[in-house]
Amino acid sequence: MKKEFWLTCISVCLLAACCEKESLPVTPTSSDLQFGHLAKTWDEGIPLGNATVGTLVWQRDSVLRFSLDRTDLWDLRPMDSIAGPNNRFAWVCEQVRKGDYLPVQKKFDHPYNALPAPSKIPGAALEFPLNIGKVFSVHLFLNNALCEVLWENGTKLQTFVHASEPVGWFVFENLPDTVSPEIIAPRYSNPDEVAGDNSHAGPALGRLGYKQGTIQKEAGTTTFHQEGWGGFSYDVVVRWQQKGGTLSGVWSLTSSLAADRADQETAEAMERGVEADYRSHMDFWKGYWAQSSVSLPDTLLQKQYDNEMYKFGSAAREDSYPISLQAVWTADNGMLPPWKGDYHHDLNTQLSYWPAYTGNHLQEGMGYLNTLWEQRDVYKKYTREYFGTDGMNVPGVCTLTGEPMGGWVQYSMSPTVSAWLGQHFYLHWKYSADRIFLKERAYPFLKDVATYLEQISTVDADGVRRLPLSSSPEIFDNSINAWFKDMTNYDLSLMHFAFNAASELASELGLADEAAHWK
């Protein structure tokens, strides 16, 4: 009897251990997103990401769909219309003085709308052909960066994007039938595609002129390969295995701009296993949430704050590209993304990274600063060609690699963009007190900005420093009225900040002459 008793106990313990492995442990909060059904459009899907890859969990028609994205999926063909003899701020100023602004719009604005690229491009989607009835719960656990979906028949899905690896995991429990995930490729072969939603969609993907990519299927593995412009390509791989009613699998999306390879990433992930990957995933998120917290008496504001901090943690990393317009959640509607999914430095990137400072997430904010620092040569070339000065300004609308894209030049090629970007170097120094960063990054960046601003501006008879023309983002759209002869508060405040900050940092470094000069 004793032997049978202990064998029974051991069996129960082993069964319990197996059950624990099936469900990944989660910690709910009052700020979690919870719904009674899956979203019906991509832009309302549950977002998961790690600043390099991301997914949106939603339902297209009646099918569960993961929209897969990666930061460095870009068509980087040059914006030829910007080049040429009139690619000069002085020419824009002259056209404004003459009251003849249509040539400016034709050169910088019209091509941005008319040409499909340069542009961010989408990755692909995963669909799961389930026939299991109605969903009754969709839950995004903020603490765990995990989405859980429950069906009325008892099926459960748990899915997460690994916090530090370019992979996403999915685990289904209690499936009544065998299920194989399917990769759904973007429709690059249809130039006449029309968006089926009310998003600010761009042109059809087919206008890029790509040959439709290839999908290869093997037992437990599917691969999608897509060629892009100029030798660029990307790959999506999904691997899975099903044992009884449990289906577990992993996907990866990689590009030719990085060393990652989707087939290798997924194979290595399957070797590690979902439990091990979830533990290392949680190591990041536990540390992330421990960095800071805010308690608000208004529950709606508390939920909004917590959700925004979750979004920041999903879109920012030290070794990632900065947060673009849609971050790692590019539109999944057969079209190019709204505003080409580019980098808007007129306020979008700046505001996206403010939580890094008071929120005690300086490490995550470094992805922004590292990219700005590494692209200085591109910015200085743009500054010499367009503004005709030394120092450094930055395009207000630019590609992954920092090249200008045109658009409404009052903000897409604004004369004060780099001043606001310089503030982030200043803030990192103030919050970190890192003197190496001050000496090697913050002051050199702001010195280049101040040098440019000094040369692009003039001092009038009253001793007041002025820009040739001034603007403020998006007021009066792209009309001639969006330019002002008097300095706007926007430009004035940015120039004041840039010179004062350059002086302060020079003084901190003991550079008295330079501090006095910028003062």
Where are the predicted features?
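Active-site cradle of extracellular carbohydrate-active enzymes
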Residues: 369-372, 376-404
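Extended, well-ordered alpha-helical scaffold segments
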Residues: 300, 304-307, 364-375, 437-453, ...
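The feature captures the catalytic groove of carbohydrate-active enzymes
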Residues: 327-342, 390-440, 454-518
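Bacterial Sec-dependent N-terminal signal peptides
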Residues: 1-25
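Beta-strand segments within the central parallel beta-sheet cores of soluble alpha/beta enzyme folds
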Residues: 28, 32, 325, 367-370, ...
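A conserved hydrophobic secondary-structure block that centers on an alpha-helix together
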Residues: 152-167, 178, 187, 415, ...
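Alpha-helical support elements that line or immediately flank enzyme active sites
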Residues: 311-314, 349-363, 419, 425-435
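Acidic/polar, glycine-enriched structural segments that form the non-catalytic walls/loops
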Residues: 19-44, 48-342, 361-366, 372-381, ...
